[in-house]
């Protein structure tokens, strides 16, 4: 645990001491946890046009570099780190999916420059990177500064609650990935 000590003199010259602690844990760090009561049934869409997605999405900074998915100009964006490869997740609210059915998936993505950025889209039964093991869009490297649509399908083997995760996984010292207009069609 890393402690930060803060001291300040009051007007009466008395000393006050404040203590705050931050934890440096070696596991995934969740900034926002999914808060809706019931899983959503597709069709489902999210534009990321404003900050409201932060209320229902789970954001995980797996490499703990303090760079994470954030609202940016009508999108969700993840930026680079000059020392660590990107390893950051943007995970949907819980979705109620039927086994044996196919759901269409699409998302618009662009990069912040001409650097190759890498992403993948996965789904699974929990909102953790370890559970998001089923590919919707395989790991893909892109470099374009206009939004382009990427598509895939979600085909769960069994019925239940599932999550979809957009994984920013670019090499270190690139620039940024921005996403908008995520859509999951009805079965």
Language-model features: where?
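Extracellular beta-rich ligand/substrate-recognition surface
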Residues: 77-88, 140-144
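Extracellular carbohydrate recognition
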Residues: 85-89, 169-186
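Extracellular carbohydrate recognition and processing domains
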Residues: 128-158
């Amino acid at each position: 645990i890393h402690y930060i000590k803060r001291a300040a003199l009051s007007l009466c010259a008395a000393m006050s001491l404040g203590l705050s602690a931050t934890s440096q844990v070696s596991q995934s760090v969740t900034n926002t946890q999914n808060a809706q009561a019931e899983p959503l049934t597709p069709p489902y869409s999210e534009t990321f046009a404003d900050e409201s997605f932060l209320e229902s999405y789970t954001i995980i900074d797996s490499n703990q570099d303090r760079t994470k998915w954030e609202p940016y100009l009508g999108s969700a964006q993840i930026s680079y780190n000059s020392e660590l490869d990107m390893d950051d997740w943007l995970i949907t609210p819980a979705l109620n999916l039927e086994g044996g059915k196919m759901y269409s998936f699409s998302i618009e993505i662009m990069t912040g420059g001409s650097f190759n950025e890498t992403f993948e889209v996965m789904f699974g039964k929990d909102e953790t990177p370890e559970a998001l093991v089923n590919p919707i869009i395989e790991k893909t490297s892109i470099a374009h500064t206009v939004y382009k649509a990427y598509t895939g399908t979600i085909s769960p083997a069994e019925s239940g609650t599932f999550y979809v995760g957009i994984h920013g996984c670019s090499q270190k010292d690139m620039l940024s990935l921005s996403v908008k207009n995520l859509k999951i069609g009805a079965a």
